[in-house]
Amino acid sequence: MSSTHWLMAWVGLELNTLAIIPIITKHHHPRSTEATTKYFLTQAAASTMLLFASTMNAWHTGTWDISQLTNQPACIMLTMALSMKLGLAPLHFWLPEVLQGTSLSTALIIATWQKLAPMALMFLTHNSLSPSTLLTMGMISALVGGWGGLNQTQTRKIMAFSSIAHLGWMVVAMTLNPRLALLNLTLYLLMTTTTFIMLMRTTSKTIKDLTTATTLSPPTTALMMTLLMSMGGLPPLTGFIPKWLILQELNDHNFPATALIMALSALLSLFFYLRLAYVSTLTAFPVTTNTAYKWRLIPKTSTLTMSLMLMASTLLLPITPMLL
């Protein structure tokens, strides 16, 4: 993240990949093995592409400095490599499958911490990357993330498509205002972490599991609805901040069509967030035996951290001017 040399940046990305692989495969299950293999092959291909792009640029410019990215083919290859590492559409196919094959805690790491290094490299090189390419990939990611999550029943896959959609918004913001993209990234990490913690607390791996979450912890389930609405970007919640500011930025830079597409894509995402909220808070499972089994799975975790993160994930809209 702090490197200015291409080789050191590549080494950092490789260490990041190799460190997460044992965490994914710690559960001895065929799905974990499959997820590990898919993750490793995808990340290795992206790292190879990044190394090739940096070597090509060094051959052309005579320097390994990250800021001296002037070779056009190298810029295109770097964009593809970082997009594959992040899971941006149309290079997103690995992300839902990998998250589905892992535990909720590991999925949290992949959806949050593992995004930091590629995003840092994208921040460092955004001036050299093609704005039209980034805008296009951002719009496609927002649409694919919203569209792909509509027919899912597994919460991990829904969170994967949610991640793809949020990354699309971040990339669009980065072409216009990197500081706004950084704010979007921070709020995304905050809201996604809180959502995963609540899913872990209610042990909800499927939408069906959410129907019995109320009996486990009524306050948690009630607050989960507010959190999901924040993830969908409804005012007056925290998640409305990045969408509002990005649409305003697009309008200020004369991109009304892009702003319209991004706003419509947010409706797709909002639909499956509403679906989760409806199932978790407004429905009750008719069979009591499933409810009884649910009580045996209460995780022994502290609620203080979750409460503080939940407050930040829902109540930051009034202090928007301080965040800019």
What are the residue ranges of the model-derived segments?
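Core, highly hydrophobic multi-pass alpha-helical transmembrane subunits of bioenergetic inner membranes
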Residues: 1-324
